């Protein structure tokens, strides 16, 4: 006579929480495994889903190119030529910044007339 999985699940469903905890501990001891290992492995996957570093990318400098160049110079500390080249290339303005800093930079550049994305 063998017990089916459904019989085991029904028996566990009728147990109290304390009985289930005791059953898990007994199974860990008998089979030399740990139920917490699966939970620990799932933890880093959740952390990977949340992005912590962002890139601020300019998609257009609009009609106010000079104002955008000034805003880029102020935000990055670049010289005039470097800031002008960066604005004209429509590339990444800043890489690997925190979300708050990225949002602030986006706001500053958009006020100057640029179109900006945070990636």
Swiss-Prot record:
Keywords (A to Z) from UniProt: Ribonucleoprotein, Ribosomal protein
Gene Ontology annotations of biological process type: translation
One Gene Ontology term, aspect cellular component: cytosolic large ribosomal subunit
InterPro entries: Ribosomal_bL12, Ribosomal_bL12_C, Ribosomal_bL12_C/ClpS-like, Ribosomal_bL12_oligo, Ribosomal_bL12_oligo_N_sf
Entries under Pfam families matching the protein: Ribosomal_L12, Ribosomal_L12_N
Gene3D superfamilies linked to this entry: 3.30.1390.10, Single helix bin
Presence of the UniProt keyword tRNA-binding in the record: no
GO molecular function, one term: structural constituent of ribosome
Function, as annotated: Forms part of the ribosomal stalk which helps the ribosome interact with GTP-bound translation factors. Is thus essential for accurate translation.
Family designation: Belongs to the bacterial ribosomal protein bL12 family.
Description of how the protein assembles with itself and partners: Homodimer. Part of the ribosomal stalk of the 50S ribosomal subunit. Forms a multimeric L10(L12)X complex, where L10 forms an elongated spine to which 2 to 4 L12 dimers bind in a sequential fashion. Binds GTP-bound translation factors.
Protein name: Large ribosomal subunit protein bL12
Organism per entry: Colwellia psychrerythraea (strain 34H / ATCC BAA-681) (Vibrio psychroerythus)
């Amino acid at each position: 006579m063998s017990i089916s999985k459904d019989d085991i699940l029904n028996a566990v469903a009728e147990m109290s929480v304390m009985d289930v905890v005791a059953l898990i501990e007994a199974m860990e001891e008998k089979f030399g495994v740990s139920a917490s290992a699966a939970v620990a492995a799932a933890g880093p996957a959740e952390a990977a889903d949340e992005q912590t570093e962002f890139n601020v990318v300019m998609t257009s400098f609009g009609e106010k190119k000079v104002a955008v160049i000034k805003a880029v110079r102020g935000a990055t500390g670049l010289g005039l030529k470097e800031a002008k080249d960066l604005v004209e290339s429509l590339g990444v303005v800043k890489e690997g910044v925190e979300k708050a800093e990225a949002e602030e930079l986006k706001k500053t550049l958009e006020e100057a007339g640029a179109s900006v994305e945070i990636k």
